[in-house]
Design a protein with these regions (language model features):
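Helix-turn-helix DNA-binding helix
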Residues: 81-82
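N-terminal leader segment of winged-helix/HTH proteins
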Residues: 1-45, 94
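Pre-recognition alpha-helix immediately N-terminal to the DNA-recognition helix
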Residues: 23, 53-57, 116
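Charged, amphipathic alpha-helical coiled-coil/dimerization segments
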Residues: 88-144
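N-terminal helix-turn-helix DNA-binding core of bacterial DNA-binding proteins
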Residues: 36-77
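Residues within the DNA-recognition helix of helix-turn-helix
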Residues: 85
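Terminal interaction helix/tail motif
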Residues: 123-179
Length: 179
């Protein structure tokens, strides 16, 4: 349902962007609920979204990952949050530290318990989510086209964030010089 009356929307174009952003917020929350709910079903009641995502990334391609690789893969600028999630995963015995190629490089890999839990997660995902998605995404290329559009929009929002940050810093410097 379009958001007709919003301080964010003074033109039709702005209205479309506002509606898109509200839809994106709903999608983001639904995605978070899905990941957390499915993760809890496999025995990780204490895990949040980032914990679950970090576990999946560590398992991805079955190779050990560094904190910077995990952060990059998740497009996170806060490695300390990833590090905290890894500590939780270590405590839960889902991941373990392994030596990296460089002397000071620490990497993480899934343990047998982490492997079992990610396998159960994948089974639930197949049985529930994939089945539902397949019921309305049978059109050839639908998911690929959707992924391409989401990737482009992620880039647009990343660029907008950089520009907003830069513009704010310039404005702050200008204001400081005037005073």
């Amino acid at each position: 349902k379009p958001i007709k009356d919003s301080f964010l929307s003074t033109t039709e174009e702005e209205l479309l962007v506002t509606d898109f952003e509200f839809s994106l917020m709903c999608l983001s929350e639904a995605f978070r609920r899905w990941i957390v709910s499915c993760t809890q079903q496999v025995g990780n009641a204490e895990f949040g979204l980032l914990d679950a995502l970090v576990l999946h990334v560590v398992r991805f391609r079955e190779t050990p990952k560094s904190i910077s690789e995990i952060s990059h893969f998740l497009s996170r600028e806060d490695p300390s949050a990833v590090q905290y999630a890894l500590r939780k995963l270590e405590t839960a015995e889902c991941v373990v530290k392994v030596a990296g190629l460089a002397k000071r490089e620490t990497r993480y890999q899934v343990t047998e318990k982490g492997l079992e839990q990610t396998e159960r997660y994948a089974e639930i995902r197949r049985d529930v989510l994939i089945r539902v998605l397949n019921s309305f995404t049978r059109e050839p290329g639908y998911m690929e086209e959707l992924m391409d559009k989401i990737t482009v929009m992620a880039g647009v929002y990343d660029q907008a964030a950089l520009r907003a940050n830069h513009a704010t810093r310039i404005k702050d410097k200008t204001s400081a010089k005037e005073n």
